[in-house]
């Protein structure tokens, strides 16, 4: 988990530094003559960067919802990022209009401010709806809104919000909402404090509610905390636009970009971690937590198909008279015996050896880079450890001593398929059990001749 986090964080950091360098270079070569304004090309670059970041976040959250449909809150959270995408597209179109000199700077700045206000409100409200669903999922309580109603409300803010913002923009003068305007000095933008205060209050409320219910756990909702906290910071900066227009804009947009990148890292790490857990569950035996039969055969297939000529060994182990243990002491004790034997085998083999449960009381071990003599010595050590440590040992709470029989085959040929190799090891195990149990039979595949 930590390695994935470091790799993704490093990639994001390099991308961020590269992006900031492009913005600074662009601003340097596009310095205005009289007005102290942000170059429109720089504005476009930032909007496009935020667009792609939110696109990645939207896709990841949708995939995570498809992966686990019980987490409906992830679906609502993905719609929050989708709403941002719509507003970013509209903002880019508006900026293009002023570049083509279709509208005055004052009108365009006010329209941009309107869509920014609605983008912030939609993002905050949709995240809040997702949070409400998450709390109900965690507490198993009935949600205030049904999933269908929540989805309808979310879709209204995703698609209805831009329509309302369009009506309140310069396209309809009778409904035009005046949020920001250019000052007479240096063309700086001044926001009305009341609208900024509303946004700050909404984000502070969301931040407080999220911290109350989710705390600072390392999961997706930790990313929501980052979004809300940074939104408070860069919206507070709007209050100082009248005095420090350009520098404040760069600071606020940098905070927003960094916060979105941080959230993307958190989302990716969380989702990759969840997928790893699922994969691990699919490959593990639920009782012993060692690998299961399917994983063992997959690894055996890979090993047998390898072009390397290094010898490897397949061991099959079986607990002697295990049915008698179950009949005498019951299945719970039988399960404890299985876990005890697994623990002893795990401590007896090498760190790189693969241990799996291939049957009820049967276990398989795949060992690489080992010859016949070393395989026989290792198998004997395993057998002796099981016999010795299960007798009168307070470390293992089992009522009687148990023994195991081991059959093994060593080969370095890749002519045999996995089933044939396993069958040879199983035949060696059969020989060990038929000739007295509690013993080891190891065969080299070249010298092992089966009876017809």
UniProtKB/Swiss-Prot annotation:
Positions bound to substrate: 326, 331, 335, 381
Active site, UniProt feature: 361
Listed transmembrane segments: 8-28, 46-66, 75-95, 112-132, 149-169, 196-216, 220-240, 255-275
The keyword Chloroplast is assigned to this record: no
Reported phenotype of the disruption mutant: A slight increase in motility. No visible effect on curli production.
Keywords per UniProt: Cell inner membrane, Cell membrane, GTP-binding, Magnesium, Membrane, Metal-binding, Nucleotide-binding, Transferase, Transmembrane, Transmembrane helix
Cell inner membrane keyword on record: yes
Coiled-coil regions, chain positions: none
Disulfide bonds: none
Pathway(s): Purine metabolism; 3',5'-cyclic di-GMP biosynthesis
Major site of localization recorded for this protein: membrane
Cofactor(s) needed by this chain: Mg(2+)
Gene Ontology annotations for the cellular component aspect, listed alphabetically: plasma membrane
Record GO biological process: c-di-GMP signaling; single-species submerged biofilm formation
Reported induction: CsrA binds to the mRNA and reduces its levels. Expressed at low levels at both 28 and 37 degrees Celsius.
Annotated residues for binding of Mg(2+): 318-319, 361
Periplasmic side: 29-45, 96-111, 170-195, 241-254
Membrane-side (Cytoplasmic) residue stretches: 1-7, 67-74, 133-148, 217-219, 276-452
The protein's name in its UniProt record: Probable diguanylate cyclase DgcT
Species whose genome carries this gene: Escherichia coli (strain K12)
Gene field: dgcT
């Amino acid at each position: 988990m930590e390695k994935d986090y470091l790799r993704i964080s490093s990639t994001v950091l390099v991308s961020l530094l590269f992006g900031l360098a492009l913005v600074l270079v662009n601003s340097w070569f596009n310095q205005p003559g009289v007005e102290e304004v942000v170059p429109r090309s720089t504005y476009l670059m930032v909007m496009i960067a935020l667009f792609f970041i939110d696109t990645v976040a939207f896709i990841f959250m949708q995939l995570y919802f498809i992966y686990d449909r019980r987490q409906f809150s992830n679906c609502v959270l993905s719609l929050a990022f989708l709403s941002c995408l719509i507003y970013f597209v509209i903002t880019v179109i508006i900026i293009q209009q002023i570049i083509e000199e279709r509208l005055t700077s004052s009108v365009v700045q006010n329209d941009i401010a309107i869509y920014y206000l609605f983008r912030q409100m939609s993002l905050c409200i949709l995240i809040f709806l997702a949070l409400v669903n998450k709390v109900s999922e965690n507490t198993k309580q009935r949600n205030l809104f049904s999933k269908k109603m929540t989805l309808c409300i979310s879709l209204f803010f995703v698609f209805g919000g831009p329509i309302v913002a369009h009506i309140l923009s310069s396209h309809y003068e009778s409904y035009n909402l005046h949020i920001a305007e250019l000052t007479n000095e240096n063309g700086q933008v001044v926001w009305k404090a009341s609208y900024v205060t509303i946004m700050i209050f909404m984000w502070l409320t969301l931040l407080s509610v999220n911290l109350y219910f989710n705390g600072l756990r390392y999961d997706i909702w930790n990313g929501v905390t980052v979004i809300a906290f940074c939104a408070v910071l860069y919206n507070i900066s709007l209050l100082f636009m009248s005095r420090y227009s350009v520098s404040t804009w760069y600071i606020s947009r940098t905070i927003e970009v960094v916060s979105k990148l941080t959230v993307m890292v958190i989302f990716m790490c969380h989702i990759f971690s969840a997928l790893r857990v699922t994969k691990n569950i699919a490959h593990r035996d639920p009782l012993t937590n060692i690998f299961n039969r399917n994983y063992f055969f997959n690894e055996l297939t890979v090993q047998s198909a390898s072009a390397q000529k290094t010898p490897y060994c397949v061991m099959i182990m079986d607990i002697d008279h295990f049915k008698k243990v179950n009949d005498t002491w019951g299945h719970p004790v039988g399960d404890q015996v299985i876990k005890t034997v697994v623990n002893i085998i795990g401590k007896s083999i090498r760190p790189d050896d693969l241990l799996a449960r291939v049957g009820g009381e049967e276990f398989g071990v795949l060992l690489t880079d080992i010859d016949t003599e070393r395989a026989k010595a290792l198998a004997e050590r395993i057998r002796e450890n099981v016999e010795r440590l299960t007798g009168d040992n307070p470390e293992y709470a089992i009522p009687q001593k148990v023994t195991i029989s081991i059959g093994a085959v060593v080969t370095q040929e890749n002519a045999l398929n996995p089933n044939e190799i396993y069958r040879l090891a199983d035949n060696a195990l059969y020989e060990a059990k038929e000739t007295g149990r509690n013993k080891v039979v190891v065969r080299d595949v070249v010298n092992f001749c089966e009876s017809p």
